[in-house]
Amino acid sequence: MPLLLTGKKFHNDLKTNKCLAIFAPLEGGYETRLLRRMRAKGFKTFITSARGLGDPEVFLLKLHGVRPPHLGHQSVGRNGALGEVQQVIPQASELFNENDKNKLLWLLEGQVLSQSELESLIEICTNDNKLTIVVEMGGSRKLEWKPLSNYILDEFES
């Protein structure tokens, strides 16, 4: 039985563009196949949701503070009016433990991201030459992808 998806064209497009917008059939399966193919080609992969991402550069790459949810009346004198700020490690920190591998960050539900957030993802890719990002931008009848910069031009500039 021949392979339905070898990942060669996807790998070549990912290497040249570094940031891709992907449209996959809603029944799934293509994402994990492509991730497996990229791992076989030497990529270290990390998959996460784009929901609640906030500032992508800070949330993915830098140490940042997160306030816990407000749970009713609390003492103002202990933590100030805004509450205690807990320091959280970057979400994609496990990608950056190894410097020798190519890194692939796969973001699910990317259709919730704004134009500026997508542009900052492209900027992150250009700053780190070993990092590549794939953003799932919704469903399609067949698997297709295009550079994220082209997606931004098509979607937001019209």
From Swiss-Prot:
Reactions it catalyzes: a plastoquinone + NADH + (n+1) H(+)(in) = a plastoquinol + NAD(+) + n H(+)(out); a plastoquinone + NADPH + (n+1) H(+)(in) = a plastoquinol + NADP(+) + n H(+)(out)
Membrane topology according to the record: Peripheral membrane protein
Entry's Gene Ontology cellular component terms: plasma membrane-derived thylakoid membrane
EC nos: 7.1.1.-
Keywords annotated in UniProt: Membrane, NAD, NADP, Plastoquinone, Quinone, Thylakoid, Translocase, Transport
InterPro entries: NAD(P)H-quinone_OxRdtase_su_N
Location in the cell: Cellular thylakoid membrane
Subunit structure and binding partners: NDH-1 can be composed of about 15 different subunits; different subcomplexes with different compositions have been identified which probably have different functions.
Name of the protein: NAD(P)H-quinone oxidoreductase subunit N
Source species of the chain: Prochlorococcus marinus (strain MIT 9215)
